[in-house]
Amino acid sequence: MMRHDRNVTEIDAETRPDENLWHSGDSAVGAPPAATPAAMTDLPEDRYLNRELSWLDFNARVLALADDNSLPLLERAKFLAIFASNLDEFYMVRVAGLKRRDEMGLSVRSADGLTPRKQLALIGEHTQRIATRHARVFLDSVRPALAEEGIHIVTWADLDQAERDELSTYFTEQVFPVLTPLAVDPAHPFPFVSGLSLNLAVMVRQTEDGGQHFARVKVPNNVDRFVELAAPRAGAEGENRGVVRFLPMEELIAAFLPLLFPGMEIVEHHAFRITRNADMEVEEDRDEDLLQALERELARRRFGPPVRLEIADDMTEGMLELLLRELDVHPGDVIEVPGLLDLSSLWQIYDLDRPALKDPAFVPDTHPAFADRESPKSIFATLREGDVLVHHPYDSFSTSVQRFIQQAAADPNVLAIKQTLYRTSGDSPIVRALIEAAEAGKQAVALVEIKARFDEQANIRWARALEQAGVHVVYGLVGLKTHCKTCLVVRREGSAIRRYCHIGTGNYNSKTARLYEDVGLLTAAPDIGADLTDLFNSLTGYSRKVSYRNLLVAPHGIRTGIIERVEREIAAHRERGQGRIRLKMNALVDEQVINSLYRASQAGVRVEVVVRGICALRPGVQGYSENIFVRSILGRFLEHSRIIHFRNINEFWIGSADMMHRNLDRRVEVLAQVKDPKLTAQLDELFESALDPSTRCWELGPDGQWTPSPQEGHTVRDHQVSLMERHRSP
């Protein structure tokens, strides 16, 4: 998995070197070396961008895809849904955390100098702008375009009498029985409103005395949001073939409110939705049983305080004041939306069987290293010949990483499988393989991170299933999330023991592996096998190893390891020039890492960052970041891999860690060095494609604004399409 108007400023030519010069050849890479460290200027206080506003900018880039007429129509609807889901989670976690700090009087400023209260105010203003734009893209662009393709999302007023009669029957039989109108009066307190539920706020009037009363009707979340009409309107023969019409469920309920309140006059009704704090706090050091502690906290999460109130823009002031008072919501937390609330429901429309309105189907290929071998031990034989780098979704996950684990479970010579699981799919073949391994008498160890946000219930369920099958289940280290993506297979080969490993950037999830871009290293290298053995001993036992042979491991080693390599790249650049650092990641926030990149820029090292989401680094500022260039690539696949390259010291690293405080200080993360020249060449090609001047992307300017690139009139290539074509070519 996931924020604004394109009112952006072009970067001044004086502050940005010629892009073709910087990109094209080795001889042009790296500015002239700074003479000495003394030549570096002090770093200014305003060198960081706000991480929360940067995240909103990321979601605005997602919204820009929904507004892109060149994309297939249902893909645009999908991006509208993704935007909405992203924003929900942002409020449940990030905004909730800021509000908690503000309410507790913890006015610790952000790296860019803002108090929690100031950040909340800016977030509210920014969210209102992009939420309005989100609604307008749907109302003014996507919805009419869907109608042109025969997919109509209609209102009750659009229906003819036959359609209304049809829906009357449907409502009476399917919807009315599950509705519970909740009145508010001295005998009925204001009802609890669950987070992310869609509701109707209804004002009714008694016909006898004219007294008005409030009632709340929850739109059921266990039925489709959009009700499909069974038959199209009458018309010429063939005219309506392929036409479908949908009515939002809240419109259907609103039309039949008199049935819910017989004898009452319906004065007004409006849709609303609240978001609640879902940021859990589990006191691990005080709870012996982490599983029970987490389950208690999950039960409490649904009752978290409100952090956002979304309302339809037709809501009256009186109704809004009532909701603010009864829900205890601050006026600054209200987001007013034209049209429909909760467009995450557009996934239902995306799921329509209309392939012409979606991206062409893409079937991942089996990696060439595994394509021609069919014996049960084929992957082990391949890895004995050399390391393999897989790039998902272009290389199939199921015929590489998944098969590696499945073959290990079935191989009688395999003695042990040790695996980390952060987020896995509902019918996970990885989990099944671990269960089969345990049932076959192998030592199977699963480190299940039950604190993976919003996957806690699923992970608890799988942890118990694994335990019942005899798998040794561990929940990680107290106070840390285990986010690394590692698997260790121990195999007897003759009189020797050999270890086979996988270290990746993405989760062991066969479903998301078709949608997320990730890389992974499969290897039988003894030093990596020894490192993973030490790592799993740390995770399952009382070992506290902090240094490794060929890995960087957080929370002790990644930040210092990266900064130390930046300093080595600077030193090498001073000796011979050609300094270049390339980073690809989901987020760049950690101030110490950012400062090290500023120092590299001041020394003349070229720094290129490809970041999907948050970036707190301010590029292109003369004196400290003029040699830093930041771009963001979004597309049909979620760019998820983390890769770092230091040119002069000739090191490539891949792994699970983004450059964020939580990854470097509060998680177990792993970066592995890729050494095989054939594999580093693959990573180099990936960087060259992502950084090509003609690649469609957004570029970050020194003012914090993101600008679409290339500009109109220039050649444009799609990074992901290019990779799909490359993987399919013979």
Curated annotation (Swiss-Prot):
UniProt-annotated binding residues for ATP: N86, Y516, R612, H640
EC class (word): transferase
Binding residues annotated for Mg(2+), in chain numbering: R423, R453
An individual GO BP term: polyphosphate biosynthetic process
GO molecular function terms noted in the UniProt entry: ATP binding; metal ion binding; polyphosphate kinase activity
EC assignment: 2.7.4.1
Compositionally biased spans, kind Basic and acidic residues: 1-21
Annotated protein name in UniProt: Polyphosphate kinase
Originating organism: Mycolicibacterium paratuberculosis (strain ATCC BAA-968 / K-10) (Mycobacterium paratuberculosis)
